[in-house]
Amino acid sequence: MDEGWDAYLRYLTRIIYNPSSALLPVIRQERARIGSPDNQIGVHIRCGGQLSDINEYTAFVTKDIMASIPGVVRSAINGSAIPRDKLFIFLSTDSSLVVDMLERELQPIPIKTTAVYTRGHSTIGLVSDDTLKRSFVDMFLVADSKELLLTSSSAFSRIVQWMSGNKHASAIIAPHSNSQGRWGRKRNDSVSL
């Protein structure tokens, strides 16, 4: 077991982000429902902007970047040592459009997401109790992944990587950009991928 400084800081980070006693059984229940982390590639896709279910001014993954993501996820699958008959993707995202697209594009690979609480943001001004709880559940479930594919400019992705101890996570390159999204509004149904 690695008991160096990095391991100590990971333990400390997990304590700081320690979920409440009410949330721990939810995380365990979701883990049991989703499946073993040994068979899981954890993927965090942070869209923001107009692709997010709740719009923001700042965009991360845009439509242009999104077009490349099925190929990036396929590359992660092809490079994985996880047996194909057991492999699944655990997806954490702020966009139901992303979930729908990856389910369609990556068949027959199972795409699994948290089934509890509400998809949204933990950003000040947009956070609700439900979205914060979902963020915690997602954070712990993604961090348990055998392999990771994370959004390069997302603080959530960096925390997940740090908590996981996985120094070799793959990245979806998605720099911050400004969007025409109106802060806090539900995504316009005319926006599609």
Language-model features: where?
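Short, aromatic/basic amphipathic alpha-helical patches
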Residues: 99-109, 159
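Donor nucleotide-activated moiety binding/catalytic core segment of transferases
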Residues: 112-145
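Short, charged/polar "capping" segments at the starts of alpha-helices
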Residues: 95-102, 182
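Short, solvent-exposed loop/turn segments at secondary-structure junctions
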Residues: 46-50, 94-98, 154-156
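Leloir-type glycosyltransferase catalytic cores
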Residues: 175-193
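Secretory-pathway luminal glycosyltransferase catalytic domains
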Residues: 1-85
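Short internal beta-strands
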Residues: 90-92
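A donor-sugar binding/catalytic signature common to diverse glycosyltransferases
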Residues: 135-180
